Amino acid sequence: MTNQVQNALSTIYEGIEYSLEFITPEQAQFYLTKNFDNNRKISRNNLEELKKEMRNSRFILSDSAICFDTDGTLVNGQHRLLAVVQTGMTQPFLVVKNMPSKS
């Protein structure tokens, strides 16, 4: 990768924060208040499968992060967060904040 490309990428992704969080039901509920209005509808099948995995201790940390854009809006993770709320079970997630907004 050339220095020019590295510099361009550094500028684009400057300020992105990432962490491993053990998200409690209370934290998940708070994060869901940051959901954007036009997000896709909740898939009951997807939600029920996530809840089943959590209840049976089969839910594992994955590379799919809970993501927030630069405005603090939740852009990825609503099903997983809702499953945490509904099961009452704390779960580990990769959380990324300050992602550039899609234009």
Model-derived features with residue positions:
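Hydrophobic alpha-helical segments and helix pairs
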Residues: 102-103
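Short alpha-helix boundary/capping and kink motifs at helix termini
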Residues: 2-86, 90-97
